[in-house]
């Protein structure tokens, strides 16, 4: 272990196996907090590589509580948070809309990072049980096409790093690990990142983790596909990394200012999301959700973004997506 730590002090990159070994020790609570702070700082200053991120993610997944993984294709749609924009919960809303469009989504989330209301804050306000067992969540995924996995329930070991992270008061590798450690291990993922510099490295990390098809996006300051500007995309398709830029016009929607999709406290967000999921949101709110659903549907093989956007809007207007929220809440 000392050899691994010395490599970091010398600003050398770790192999995936070394990173996995290092984070295994952190997650098991076997590393002194002072040393942990030094390690996280050294990684941050050096800049985390895809090997290091993949190794850390594998360590967290290996130590996570198990989830009965389905053998069908299913996805996660998630952002790192931390983009400081306080927008409405786009990825959480998109998960229900995508499920209503006929694909399966197992969303892994936590309490708010950059918005006042993270995915789990919002779901709680709808009466959805965050403490649902793994078996019940799997059943919901089978029956409804959507399930929510609350991170602390599966990743107890992360608590060992919490005091250090809170004291450091800066972003560390843990801020980007959340979306990579879904315990259901989806084979498709749409992930938003808070910085355009992360788009390629995170996509390379996903390639190493064996995802079938995935896209990493940064939308003009947002950890989502943007409707106020361009979105940088790195997509994994058949083991290849393809990079491109998308504009709102590619989805057939107008451009809207960022202010048009600001969120609020969980209760305010609940009202906004209810409006969107019943087809009564503003044009900007509906478009913001629809473009993210559209790119997710592309990852399931529906290549036409404009048609996908229209499908998502039609599903919102039909009320089907809101019906799934209610059905998930009824499962207690």
Curated annotation (Swiss-Prot):
GO molecular function: anthranilate phosphoribosyltransferase activity; magnesium ion binding
Pathway: Amino-acid biosynthesis; L-tryptophan biosynthesis; L-tryptophan from chorismate: step 2/5
Residues that coordinate or bind Mg(2+) 2: 223-224
Gene3D superfamilies (alphabetical): Nucleoside phosphorylase/phosphoribosyltransferase catalytic domain, Transferase, Pyrimidine Nucleoside Phosphorylase, Chain C
Cofactor: Mg(2+)
Residues engaged in binding anthranilate 1: 79, 110
EC id: 2.4.2.18
Residue sites binding 5-phospho-alpha-D-ribose 1-diphosphate per the record: 79, 82-83, 87, 89-92, 107-115, 119
Cofactor remark: Binds 2 magnesium ions per monomer.
GO biological process: L-tryptophan biosynthetic process
Binding positions for anthranilate 2 per the UniProt entry: 165
Subunit (UniProt): Homodimer.
Family to which this protein belongs: Belongs to the anthranilate phosphoribosyltransferase family.
This protein's name: Anthranilate phosphoribosyltransferase
UniProt source species: Vibrio cholerae serotype O1 (strain ATCC 39315 / El Tor Inaba N16961)
Gene behind this protein: trpD
């Amino acid at each position: 272990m000392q050899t691994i730590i010395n490599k970091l002090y010398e600003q050398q990159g770790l192999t995936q196996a070394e990173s996995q070994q290092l984070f295994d020790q952190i997650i098991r609570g076997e590393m002194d907090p002072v040393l942990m702070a030094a390690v996280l700082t050294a990684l941050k200053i050096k800049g985390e590589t895809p090997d290091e991120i993949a190794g850390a993610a594998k360590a967290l997944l290996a130590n996570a509580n198990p989830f009965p993984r389905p053998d069908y294709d299913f996805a996660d749609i998630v952002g790192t948070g931390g983009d400081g924009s306080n927008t409405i919960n786009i990825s959480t809303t998109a998960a229900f809309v995508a499920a209503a469009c006929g694909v399966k989504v197992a969303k892994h989330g936590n309490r708010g990072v950059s918005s006042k209301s993270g995915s789990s804050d919002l779901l709680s306000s709808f009466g959805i049980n965050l403490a649902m067992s793994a078996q019940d969540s799997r059943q919901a995924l089978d029956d409804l096409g959507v399930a929510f996995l609350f991170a602390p329930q599966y990743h107890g070991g992360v608590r060992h790093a919490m005091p250090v992270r809170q004291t450091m008061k800066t972003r560390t590798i843990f801020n980007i690990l959340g979306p990579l450690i879904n315990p259901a291990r989806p084979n498709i993922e749409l992930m938003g990142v808070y910085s355009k510099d992360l788009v390629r490295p995170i996509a390379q990390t996903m390639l190493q983790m064996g995802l079938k098809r995935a896209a990493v996006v940064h939308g003009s300051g947002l950890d989502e596909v943007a409707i106020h500007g361009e979105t940088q995309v790195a997509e994994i398709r058949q083991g290849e990394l393809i990079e491109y830029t998308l504009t709102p016009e590619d989805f057939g929607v107008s451009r809207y200012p960022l202010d048009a999709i600001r969120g609020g406290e969980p209760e305010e967000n609940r009202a906004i999301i209810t409006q969107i999921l019943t087809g009564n949101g503003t044009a900007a709110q509906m478009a913001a959700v629809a473009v993210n659903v559209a790119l997710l549907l592309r990852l399931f093989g529906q290549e036409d973004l404009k048609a996908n956007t229209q499908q998502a809007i039609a599903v919102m207007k039909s009320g089907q997506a809101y019906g799934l929220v209610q059905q998930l809440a009824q499962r207690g």
